Amino acid sequence: MAVSFQTKNPLRPITNIPRSYGPTRVRVTCSVTTTNPQLNHENLVVEKRLVNPPLSKNNDPTLQSTWTHRLWVAAGSTTIFASFAKSIIGGFGSHLWLQPALACYAGYVFADLGSGVYHWAIDNYGGASTPIVGAQLEASQGHHKYPWTITKRQFANNSYTIARAITFIVLPLNLAINNPLFHSFVSTFAFCILLSQQFHAWAHGTKSKLPPLVMALQDMGLLVSRKDHPGHHQAPYNSNYCVVSGAWNKVLDESNLFKALEMALFFQFGVRPNSWNEPNSDWTEETETNFFTKI
């Protein structure tokens, strides 16, 4: 049995196929609807973050003392006390009083001279790259631009480098020498040198912030005064180097001793002191108000 399938309309050939195959462009339109979620204030969590406070004259860590600073000051003070004890014990044993007293006075006088020579040297020679003492040279020379910072430094921060040097110098002397006159001189000299940076800081202080005793000693000429020392911070920055009593400043400045030493070093080694250079922004004083305004 044969079955035949017939359609009403017979099949026709497809003749409407496009001959070119160009790209088809389709335009799609998207719409986005946003909704504002309702905040649940009860579930909000505030995360606490530690934020560094802005730098100020009261929290600058470079002006604060560390335990290392304090230990060096304690070590230096101990060696000075040991030297002074030897002078007292020796004085009792030998029944000498006038000579040790004169030796103490000589130590005080020469401490002022020593502070001036040292201050002149570190102000004029070397810099941050100088081995061993580079950091101290940089701080001393930078003091001309920011002189007021010395009044913000804590005592041990301001004095530990001197105390460290005193420890290494005076300790061997204590062990090797017992002469009471020698120790009268050494203990007084070292004591004044140890405190010289504090005397220096007081010379930059305002009258309202200084203890009455300090002001009295300054007025008597026993400590470097607030009136005389500021001349050191005026161009050409080549005077008033002594910072214990300041008694040697007039002698050294009028005799031109430091200028003669500078000439000798220049002709011998070809090294120019900083005081010969034209004043620039590195040495021009910037006031405390202007400095903290920039921070």
UniProtKB/Swiss-Prot annotation:
Gene Ontology biological-process entries: fatty acid metabolic process
* Keywords per UniProt: Chloroplast, Fatty acid metabolism, Lipid metabolism, Membrane, Oxidoreductase, Plastid, Transit peptide, Transmembrane, Transmembrane helix
Tell me the Pfam families matching this sequence. Lipid_desat
Principal localization reads plastid
> Membrane topology for this entry?
Multi-pass membrane protein
Report the EC code(s) recorded for this entry.
1.14.19.-
Q: Where in the cell is it found?
A: Plastid, Chloroplast membrane
Any stretches that span the bilayer, and where are they?
A: 72-92, 102-122, 175-195
What are the GO cellular component annotations? chloroplast membrane
**Record keywords: Glycoprotein included?**
no
Q: Name one GO molecular function term.
A: oxidoreductase activity
- InterPro entries linked: Chloroplast_FAD_CarF, Lipid_desat
Copy the pathway line from the protein's UniProt record: Lipid metabolism; fatty acid metabolism
- The transit peptide is at 1-29
* Similarity comment: family membership: Belongs to the fatty acid desaturase CarF family.
What does the record give as the function of this protein? Fatty acid desaturase involved in the production of chloroplast-specific phosphatidylglycerol molecular species. Catalyzes the formation of a trans double bond introduced close to the carboxyl group of palmitic acid, which is specifically esterified to the sn-2 glyceryl carbon of phosphatidylglycerol.
What protein name is recorded for this chain?
Fatty acid desaturase 4-like 1, chloroplastic
What gene is this protein translated from?
A: FAD4L1
